[in-house]
Curated annotation (Swiss-Prot):
Domain Helicase ATP-binding: 27-192
Domain Helicase C-terminal, residue spans: 432-594
InterPro entries, per the entry: Helicase/UvrB_N, Helicase_ATP-bd, Helicase_C-like, P-loop_NTPase, UVR_dom, UVR_dom_sf, UvrB, UvrB_inter
PROSITE patterns referenced in this protein's UniProt entry, alphabetically: HELICASE_ATP_BIND_1, HELICASE_CTER, UVR
Disulfide bonds: none
CDD domains: DEXHc_UvrB, SF2_C_UvrB
UVR domain: residues covered: 638-673
Source organism of this protein record: Nitratidesulfovibrio vulgaris (strain DP4)
Protein name: UvrABC system protein B
One of the record's GO molecular function terms: DNA binding
Amino acid sequence: MADTCFRLHTEFEPTGDQPEAIGQIVANLGQGVRDQVLLGVTGSGKTFTVANVIAACNRPALILAPNKTLAAQLYNEFRALFPDNAVEYFVSYYDYYQPEAYVPASDTYIEKDSSINDNIDKLRHAATHALLTRRDVVIVASVSCIYGLGSPEYYARLVIPVECGQRFSMDALMTRLVEVQYQRNDFDFHRGTFRVRGDVLEVIPAYHHERALRIEFFGDDIDAISEIDPLTGEVLGSVGKTVIYPASHYVSDRDNLVRAMSDIRDELGERLREYQSANRLVEAQRLEQRTMLDLEMMEELGYCNGIENYSRHLDGRAAGQPPSCLLDYFPDDFLLFVDESHITVPQVGAMYKGDRSRKSTLVDFGFRLPSALDNRPLEFAEFLTRINQTVYVSATPGKWELDRSQGVIAEQIIRPTGLVDPVVEVRPTRGQVDDLLAECRARAARDERVLITTLTKRMAEDLTEHLGNMGLSVRYLHSDIDTMERMAIIQALRRGECDVLVGINLLREGLDIPEVSLVSILDADKEGFLRSTGSLIQTFGRAARNAAGRVILYADTVTASMRAAMDETARRRERQQAWNEANGIEPRTIRKSLDTPFDAIYSAASEGGKGRGRGRGRQAAPAVENVAEYGTSPEDMAKHIQKLEREMREAAKELEFERAATLRDRIRLLRERLIEA
C-alpha cells in the first residue's frame, strides 16, 4: 500500500479563527480525544480548516455529508485542495430506486426497480480501490457508507495480479475475470468488460472509464502489458505489473459460493417447515419458487438478481451480525468528519428502522428468507463501534454531538472574507405579503436574490403564484424535486433567470448562494422543528455570504427560539465587526463560480475520456437534440430529462430495447448539456 503524504494546494493561509481551530483539533487528535466539535458559522471556511487538519495528521479521512448535493460540493472543494491525492466520492449509485416491497392490505407486491448511474458506480469502485491501495485518501460520502457493501476481505482476496513474464494462460485469465464479475463483450467495450483479439486480451477495470489494460500473450506466458485508450486503441504507456480488482463489490469464489448455496438451501428448508406447520401454503410455495430460481441462477452464472439479499451467507456471518460496509474498508486510524452533524447524526440513526420495517413484511409473507434482514444499514450503535476519532462539523451542533464531545469544542466564528452575520429584523404579519413584495422588487432592481421560507406547501404554492402574478420571476423548491432539477433551479436563481426562490424545509443547510441578499421567514413565531433555534440560525446563514445580507422575520411575538437565534447572530456579528476593524478589512460579497457541485463528479468519471460514456462515444446519440421541444433553461432541461427517463423505463418494460437505448443516449447528451448550461 502506497504511503504518500497529503499535499495541500492553496494560495491562502489560515486566518481569523482558523489557525486556532486547526491547532486545537490537531492537538486533540494527537492526544487521543475521540470526539470533538468544530462549531463554525456559514462562510468561515470550515472545509479549509478540515483540509488543514487532514494534511497535518496525514491520515485517511471520511467526510460524511447528509445528502448527495452537499457531498458533491465537498468533493469538488477537496479535489481542488488535494489534487495530488486520492479524493473520492461514495454515494448511492441509483438515479432512480423503487425498493422491493409488499402491501398486505391490498395484496400488492412491488418489484424492485432501479436505474444505476454508471458514473457514480465507477466512482464507488474508485473509492474502495483507493482505500485498498494507498493511505492518502479522502472519501466524501453520504449515508450510503453504512449500507452493506460486500466483504473487503473477499474483495481484496479475489484481485487478479498480472505481470510481464508471468505464467498465466489466456483461458485461465478469462476464467478468473468471469469469476470476479467481468463480462466478455467483443463488440460493446465498456467498463467492467473484456474482449479478445487473437493473442491479445483487453479489459476496462471497474474503477476506470478512460483507460483499459492490453495484455499480450506468447503461448501461456504474459508477454506485455500496456495501458490504452479504449476508444482509439492508442497505447498510453507500458506496465510491468498491475492488479485487476473485481467488477462488483458482491463477489465470491466458487468454493464459498457452493457453501453459501448449501446454507441458503438449509435456511429455505427450515423456513418452509415453519410455513407448512402454520398452514401458510401460499407463502411456502412463493418462497420456494423464488429462492430456487435464485439458486439456479447462482449455480449457472455465479450471481443472481438481488444477490445482496443473500450477503449474510456469502460473507459467512451469523444471524443478526452486521454486514460489511465502506467503513470496513478504512484502516483503523482513519479520521471521520461529520458535516452538518445536527442533520447527519439523526439520519444515520434512522436508516436501520426504516429498512427493517419494509423487509420484515417481505420476510413475513414469503417473498424473502429471514437472512435478507441482515442485508441492511448499520444500527447506530454498530456505526459507533466502527468509527475512530470523530470531528462533528456544524454551525448549530445538536445536543447529542455536544454531549458526546464533553465540551471539547473548537469555535470558528470569524470569516476571513470579513462578511458579518446578517441584520435580523422582526416585522408584524399584518400586510406581510405586500411588504415582502416591495422588498423583493427592491432586491430585483439591484440584481440581488431573495429566499423565502414558509411553513406549508399550500402557502408556498400560493405565495409563488401571487408573486409571479405581480411581475416577479419566482420559483418554488419542494421535496418532490430530484437532486439534478433542484440544482438546476438554484443555478437559475444564481444566474438571475429568477429573482425569488420559495421553499419550506429545503432552504437551510448547504445552499451556497452569494447572490442572496435577503432571507424572509414567514410565520417565524410558530414554534416547532422548522422554527427551532438551530433551524433559524441555519436559515439566517443563507444571507451571510452577501455584504448586504439581511433577514426579515414576520411574526407577532418573539418566541424563545427567535430570541436565542437573534442573540447568537448578534454575538457573532459583533465579534466579526471587531475583527474587521482590528485588521482593516472591508466586507465584500463572495464571488463564486457558477459551476454546479456535480461538474466535478462527471468530469472525474470521464476524465481523460471526454464523451466516451461506456466506451462507445456518442455514436448512438442523435447528432442534434431538438431544444425547441423543451426549452433551454436548466429547469426545463431537467424536467425533460425526467420525462425521457420515464419513457426509457416504459420502453424497456415493453421490450422495446432499441427505443430505450436511443432514449438513454439522448438522456446522456442532455445531462452533459445541463452541466454545461
